[in-house]
A protein has these predicted regions:
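Short amphipathic helix-loop junctions that connect adjacent transmembrane helices
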Residues: 17-37
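Multi-pass alpha-helical transporter architecture, strongest
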Residues: 115, 165-198, 205-207
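Hydrophobic core of transmembrane alpha-helices in multi-pass small-molecule transporters
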Residues: 6, 93-109
């Protein structure tokens, strides 16, 4: 789950860092976009995320964790392919605008599913550590993904290779979804946890 989370949070980081730079530079046939136009597109993707977060999150919550994580990755793949394709068309802004929908949908489906998977996949005594590691995925992605994106954009002059690479990476981590085994049944019944009476308190143990 951590590996999948790093890829997904990397995609989120690239939407906020590499995408505006790609828009300003332009593509192979797509003209460059002004800073105002780039800002408007970023505002559009944030607005879409706000609108989709609750209904999509509620929808995937009624299904398995694999479904939620897989839906998020599929949304990222479709969005990346649309972003890469936009560079070959003079009216590529249409494809970029369309790409905002699956990207926002994927983020809305992935984030709650990933957080839930981190909790359910981890033994009770290690859940605090797992959530700390999950939060570090954002830090790792925010540091590494923009650095890789900047290097590719400087070398290529456009974002085709970057977005195709991200689509391939998202597809490559999908087999890891088979390892996700939630601790909750389909009937939302939790696996019984340890009773407090079964775990001796240090104070009680000392009295004994």
């Amino acid at each position: 789950v951590l590996a999948i989370s790093i890829v997904a949070t990397g995609m989120i980081a690239l939407r906020q860092s590499a995408l505006p730079l790609d828009l300003v530079r332009g593509g192979l046939s797509r003209p460059a976009v002004s800073e105002a136009g780039s800002g408007a597109l970023i505002a559009l993707q944030l607005a879409l995320l706000v609108v989709l977060q609750w209904p999509v999150g509620n929808w995937v919550a009624k299904r398995s964790l694999r479904f939620g994580l897989g839906t998020g990755l599929v949304g990222f793949v479709i969005g990346c392919l649309l972003l890469a394709s936009s560079a070959f068309w003079s009216g590529g802004m249409v494809l970029i605008s369309l790409a905002m929908v699956p990207l926002a949908f994927g983020e809305a489906a992935f984030l709650p599913s990933a957080a839930e998977a981190m909790v359910e996949e981890t033994p009770l005594k290690h859940r605090g550590l797992s959530m700390a590691l999950f939060s570090q995925c954002f830090a790792i992605s925010a540091t590494g993904a923009p650095l890789l994106a900047g290097t590719l954009l400087d070398q290529q002059g456009h974002g085709v290779q970057l977005w195709l690479l991200m689509a391939v990476i998202c597809l490559a981590v999908m087999p890891l979804l088979k390892t996700v085994r939630p601790r909750y049944t389909a009937g939302l019944q939790a696996t019984p946890l340890e009773n407090d009476e079964d775990v001796p308190s240090p104070r009680i143990a000392s009295l004994r």
